[in-house]
A protein has these predicted regions:
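Fungal secretory targeting signals
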Residues: 1-21
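A compositional/structural signature for long, glycine/proline-rich flexible linkers
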Residues: 19-352
Length: 352
């Protein structure tokens, strides 16, 4: 079976700073990820996920199959075709999730890039929204932002906290090119586990401040959980604090239209660029040297290697990782079209 491999080595600079006094209400004792906001957004995504996209899904399957065909891979092979169908369905749902939480005047913390999972609140199955080489041990959350406004993120760390992570500012919801970053190791946390980040366009050197570039549209928050017995993601909520600003909430029709637009953009980007130009163009069974990529969604403090392998049942591939100055590395393995195998039942990645 032809599979993809992606290795990331992350180097993070740390700086000792003091947390300024901040008086905020105690945060609710809820799941750090499955929050009431998350449940509300998941319910809306589930309601809208059958939006009229059959034509776009057909285009996506055809485009991905065309790309793999250029490299001698037959997408009509039953298991590959099944992988393709799953990947296209999840890519479509991920575009809907982006469209649901895209308004900088109505910012919410939304966990995305998840495998299919049941809703604990309402009992329905939430479709998977993985795409573009998700990391099974990453908790991904997004917040829409705009440099015109001021925001505050309030959070709380429980247990061991995450292994690694950070806040990456991106300027495009599809390509998700990095235009700024705040490494998690710079986050100053109070002794009770609480923390506050301020976000606006200023280049302040104050602790826990994130400067929003003029072209940023969203923050991708990553919490890496390497030891699921001791480490936990941080709880986070966001508030826009610019006075006197308001906007109507998005309608379901506008969300669906925006999702279709994101899907149309995603098809050539993830098929031609990520799968073809970034991955399959490399020699098979060779893990290429990691490089910095700002063109695709990788963190500014991260170097990455997009590679692919095709082994028989009697072959093995040995990969040697030399971490160098990196503080953390991960080696995930994916199905052909860039989503992880079932992380609940299969070993799909290794990390430091």
């Amino acid at each position: 079976m032809h599979l993809l491999s992606y290795i990331a080595l992350i180097t993070t600079l740390t700086q000792a700073v003091a947390m300024p006094a901040y008086n905020f209400a105690s945060l609710p004792e809820v799941s750090p990820v499955d929050t009431p906001t998350q449940q509300r957004l998941d319910a809306l995504a589930h309601k809208l996920h059958q939006f009229a996209n059959s034509e776009l899904k057909a285009q996506a399957r055809e485009r991905f199959a065309s790309v793999t065909g250029q490299y001698g891979i037959n997408a009509q092979f039953p298991t590959i075709q099944q992988d393709l169908d799953t990947s296209v369905d999840e890519l479509a749902f991920s575009c809907l999730q982006k469209a649901i939480n895209v308004g900088p005047l109505h910012p919410m913390v939304y966990s995305v890039l998840n495998p299919p999972r049941p809703s604990k609140q309402d009992g329905f199955m939430i479709p998977g929204g993985r795409y573009a080489n998700d990391h099974p041990e990453q908790i991904y959350r997004t917040i829409p932002v705009n440099a015109k406004y001021d925001y505050v993120i309030r959070g709380k760390r429980t247990g061991g906290g995450p292994q690694d992570g950070g806040f990456t500012l991106i300027n495009n919801h599809t390509a998700q090119s990095s235009v700024g970053a705040f490494p998690l190791r710079k986050l100053v946390v109070n002794t009770d586990g609480t923390f506050v980040l301020t976000l606006n366009a200023t280049n302040s050197t104050a602790p826990n401040h994130v400067s929003i570039p003029s072209d940023a549209v969203s923050i991708m928050i990553r919490n890496t959980i390497a030891d699921w017995k001791t480490q936990t993601p941080d709880y986070m909520e966001v508030e826009i604090v610019t006075p006197g600003v308001s906007a109507p909430s998005a309608t379901e029709e506008s969300i669906v239209n925006k999702a279709r637009g994101y899907f149309s953009e995603a098809i050539p980007f993830y098929a031609d660029f990520l799968l073809g130009n970034q991955t399959l163009t490399n020699p098979v069974n060779v893990i290429v040297q990691p490089t910095v990529s700002t063109a695709f969604r990788t963190v500014i403090t991260q170097v990455s290697s997009f590679s692919h392998y095709n082994l028989s049942s009697t072959e093995a591939l040995v990969i040697t990782v030399q971490p160098g100055p990196s503080t953390y590395w991960i080696l995930p393995s994916y199905r052909l079209f860039g989503i992880s195998d079932n992380p609940w039942t299969r070993l799909s990645h290794l990390s430091s």
